[in-house]
Regions:
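Short phosphate-binding loop-to-helix
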Residues: 11-45, 104
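Short aromatic-hydrophobic micro-motifs that form the base-stacking/packing surface
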Residues: 47-49
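Conserved catalytic core of nucleotide-sugar-dependent glycosyltransferases
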Residues: 74-95, 102
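Short, glycine-/small-residue-rich phosphate/pyrophosphate-handling segment
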Residues: 93-114
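Conserved alpha/beta core of the MobA/IspD/sugar-nucleotide pyrophosphorylase nucleotidyltransferase superfamily
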Residues: 109-154
Length: 154
């Protein structure tokens, strides 16, 4: 999907001094590879977040950035379902995302194995919930209700 022609996003990018880039073709891994590779050409570190997680805030993102500043090559924000909601990098090894079964409950385990095989040092943040299936929406509703009455939920 190419949202670089969306008027709202173009205005926001212009106002913030940012550049919109098309994701291009391929699976999630190929698209993340291009995004991270391009960002690392300009910046010391990059953090990629999923749009299907409502459970991170400025502190969570700050913890991810702090891990990268402490010298880790990567940081992961695990999802409750076996995937991850956040990935950050200070360096990118070839094939870090290649051949992953995106959407499977083994993505996080596979990513850990890949990091280890590539010699990357990584830090993991606390788990967060994301929204992949209909039942995840029910959990989100339960969490909102719990917050409204003063309890906590993942």
């Amino acid at each position: 999907m190419d949202d670089t022609t969306d008027a709202f996003l173009r205005e926001l990018a212009s106002r913030e001094g940012r550049t919109l880039r098309a994701q291009g073709d391929g699976d999630l891994g190929a698209r993340m590879w291009r995004a991270v590779d391009a960002a690392l050409a300009e910046y010391r570190a990059v953090i990629v977040v999923g749009s299907d997680c409502l459970g991170y805030d400025a502190a969570y993102l700050g913890d991810a950035a702090a891990a990268l500043e402490r010298g880790f090559d990567a940081v992961l924000g695990p999802a409750l379902d076996g995937g991850y909601v956040l990935a950050g990098f200070t360096r990118l090894a070839p094939a870090v995302f290649a051949g992953m079964s995106w959407g499977a409950d083994t993505v996080l385990a596979c990513q850990r194995e890949r990091f280890a095989a590539l010699g990357l040092r990584w830090h993991e943040l606390p788990e967060r919930a994301d929204i992949d299936r209909a039942q995840d929406l029910w959990r989100l509703g339960d969490a909102a209700q719990a917050l409204a009455i003063g309890r906590t939920s993942p």
